[in-house]
Curated annotation (Swiss-Prot):
Protein name: RNA helicase NPH-II
Keyword Lipoprotein (UniProt): no
Superkingdom classification of source: Viruses
Motif extent (DEXH box): 308-311
Any one GO cellular component localisation term in the record: virion component
Catalyzed reactions per annotation: ATP + H2O = ADP + phosphate + H(+)
A molecular function GO annotation: ATP hydrolysis activity
Domain Helicase ATP-binding: 184-359
Protein species of origin: Molluscum contagiosum virus subtype 1
Domain Helicase C-terminal: 392-563
Gene it is expressed from: NPH2
């Protein structure tokens, strides 16, 4: 089967609805059978065999052979399968849903189909007698759908996946039947699939539901035209941050009609999982929503791997791309998603030459108006440029302001800039509700609830945190400074965003209502950002050794400094830890400094205290003593007084990054050596 039969389309409750087919409808569809292709209903043999019929057996009740699943409260006897399989139908009663044999034996439609659906059955051979029971079983299992009919209701989708409530109505381009069919063709062919389409068409919110549905029906199969035992594995939606895992996981759970995670086909996976996010009912076909780090640690436990936001070049996601390319045969399907491939399309086509590009048309659901506010200062004069930008942002909030009860997002580069702009806007625009949102903001859901409840116009001042996979219900305006802070070993620098980031930021509006995108930078100055050249290279080495990759050839993005890569390899070798031990630690611990692996490898109380420090920020004397003993030194080279504190120029004195210089602010004048606790905190 290459094409998705319409009877198995996922109900969007907009144009496609759950539907139970009658025997008369089945008979009317028979002439549409095309040549040697199996009838659409024949493919119901897969989900029935995988789910409803698992563990089923034949019984005789009041003279009728039926499945134990069909029994009523009366007495019955179990019938050996070998005996029941001798039955051959002579007549069929479409009202009673029964076949009658030449000897007068009566068997239910579903029981007959159950007996005939054995491994090796070629579905193109399914005749009407077999199809009748597949339709009955499929109706009882609630796996069929169809285009809108008179009286169609969203309520009919309740129970399709064991859901208490109906599927949410989803008028998204990604759930149109042509988009479903295109995605299914690539998924069934096991070709790498790159899903593109503007923000708001439903990639993150809808495509995972489709793949869960396909996996539930047909996952784990080699050839859909020949019935065989299925090797079922879950679908994983892999995301770069915990906040996105929680937000999207719960949104998917609600969209599938479940009031809680427990008992649903959605599982969240991130470090230190909160009890409220646990789900003990792990169905084999489930949708796992996971951080990239945890996905990479158990990659081949999944049948379909969905990597979202590939344009972000999250380190773990880029490593995962390399592993999936080298070990294609160990997963069934690879699906990559991005709103924009401006910076990546050529490399993806080279990396996965047989990839299927599935474009979902429609940039956003609503119109977006662009407004350019020019900064006349020379960007090389940072102070003048910043001061004019602040004036421009304040003026734009007067000229282009959200209505009462709506909000805007102001994108800046760093947490410090968030706080600075929040103070400015609070002072100059007291009529606005001003909120700061970034990766370290506690309880973002509660903050957004406050924004939604506000009668005032609000502004969310944010780092790129709000750039991806987030729909804010009341947002109508984006104000974009065009800045991003790119971390680097022992520091980082502020840069202009890439074209892909511009597309993402612009796409925060136009999802739920018309929007305005106000930008304060010159788009002609934008260029792609090669993040690997601003990252520690240790994880690339650790995961490459575990998965048998050749460095740097197998990497999706290769570092520019290959000599640095070699020095990092030699440095890790000096730890005296086996590659598998390093992999275990990298995939289960934060390892904010790779040198922490030496403490974790020794185990004991010190390792547990270090784990609490990394996860919760709990600092003890023992933790500091353990880290200090690693001798991670930096030298203070010089200092100058600035705004009531000293700004020190320091130099890393250990490892492959020795000689890297960074700035350190402290109220005291420091001299000599300091000891690094993390790459951005120190003790004397």
């Amino acid at each position: 089967m290459k094409n998705l039969p319409g009877v198995f389309a996922f109900p969007d409750n907009e144009t496609i609805f759950a539907h139970a087919y009658s025997q008369r409808e089945l008979e009317a569809m028979l002439p549409a059978r095309a040549g040697a292709q199996p009838h659409a209903f024949a493919y119901a043999a897969w989900p029935l065999s995988k789910h409803r019929w698992r563990g089923a057996f034949v019984c005789r009740q009041r003279g009728v052979l039926k499945l134990n699943l069909e029994l009523d409260a009366g007495a019955f006897e179990r019938v050996p399968r070998s005996e029941a399989e001798r039955f051959e139908p002579e007549q069929s009663d479409a009202r009673a849903l029964m076949h009658r044999g030449a000897d007068g034996t009566v068997m239910s439609f579903e029981c007959y189909s159950f007996l005939r659906c054995r491994p090796g059955l070629e579905l193109r051979e399914a005749g009407l007698a077999l199809l009748r029971g597949l339709v009955v079983g499929g109706n009882r299992m609630r796996i069929f759908s169809g285009v809108r009919r008179a009286g169609a209701s969203a309520a009919t989708s309740a129970g399709m996946l064991g859901n208490e409530s109906p599927f949410e109505r989803a008028p998204f381009a990604s759930l149109r039947i042509d988009a479903q069919a295109a995605l299914f063709r690539a998924w069934a062919a096991r070709r790498p699939t790159v899903v593109t389409g503007g923000t708001g068409v439903g990639k993150t919110s809808q495509v995972p539901k489709l793949l869960l549905w396909f996996n539930y029906l047909f996952g784990g199969t080699e050839d859909l035209d020949v019935l065989a035992p299925a090797r079922e594995r879950p679908v994983v939606l892999s995301l770069p941050r915990v906040a996105l895992v929680r937000m999207n996981g719960h949104a998917l759970r609600r969209a599938l009609g479940f009031d809680a995670l427990e008992g649903s086909p959605v599982e969240l996976r991130y470090g230190d999982l909160a009890p409220a996010d646990a789900n003990s009912s792990r169905s084999p076909f489930r949708l796992v929503v996971s951080t990239n780090q945890l996905t990479l640690g158990a990659l081949f436990a999944h049948g379909t791997v969905i990597l979202d936001e590939v344009h972000e070049h999250d380190q773990m996601a880029d490593i995962m791309l390399a592993v999936l390319r080298v070990h294609r045969a160990r997963v069934d399907s690879i699906v990559l998603m991005s709103a924009t491939l401006e910076d990546d399309r050529e490399r993806l086509q080279e990396f996965f030459p047989d990839a299927e590009f599935v474009h979902i048309p429609g940039s956003t659901r609503f119109e977006i108006r662009g407004v350019y506010v020019r900064n006349s200062s020379d960007p090389r004069d940072a102070r003048a440029y910043d001061e004019e930008e602040r004036r421009n942002v304040s003026a734009a909030l007067s000229a282009h302001r959200p209505r009462a009860g709506r909000c805007g997002i102001l994108f800046v580069a760093s947490v410090a800039q968030c706080e600075d702009y929040a103070r400015l806007l609070t002072r100059e625009h007291p009529e606005l509700g001003v909120y700061v949102v970034h990766g370290k903001t506690p309880n973002v859901d509660a903050l957004l609830a406050e924004v939604y409840a506000s009668a005032r116009p609000c502004v969310l001042v944010s780092t790129p945190y709000l750039e991806s996979s987030v729909t804010i219900r009341t947002v109508t305006h984006v104000y974009d400074t065009g800045r991003v802070f790119v971390p680097a070993p022992f520091g980082g620098r502020q840069m202009l965003i890439s074209p892909a980031m511009r597309t993402q930021r612009r796409g925060r509006v136009g999802r739920v209502m018309p929007g305005t995108y106000v930008y304060f930078y010159d788009p002609a100055r934008l260029a792609p950002i090669k993040r690997i050249d601003s990252e520690f290279l240790y994880n690339y080495i650790i995961y490459a050794r575990h998965y048998g990759l050749v460095l740097p050839d197998d990497l999706y993005v290769q570092p520019s400094d290959l000599e640095l890569l070699r020095r990092c390899e030699e440095y890790l070798d000096g730890f005296g830890l086996a590659p598998e031990r390093l992999f275990e630690l990298a995939s289960t611990r934060y390892l904010r400094m790779v040198e922490y692996a030496k403490i974790y490898a020794r185990g004991g109380a010190r390792a547990e205290e270090l784990n609490r420090f990394e996860r919760d920020g709990v600092v003890t004397e023992d933790v500091l003593a353990s880290i200090r003993a690693l001798n991670l030194r930096a030298r203070v080279l010089s200092a100058r007084a600035r705004r009531g504190q000293f700004l020190h120029t320091c130099e890393v004195a250990f490892g492959p990054y020795a000689g890297t210089r960074f700035l350190l602010a402290n109220r005291r004048r420091l001299r000599g050596d300091i000891f690094m606790v993390t790459e951005r905190s120190f003790v004397l």
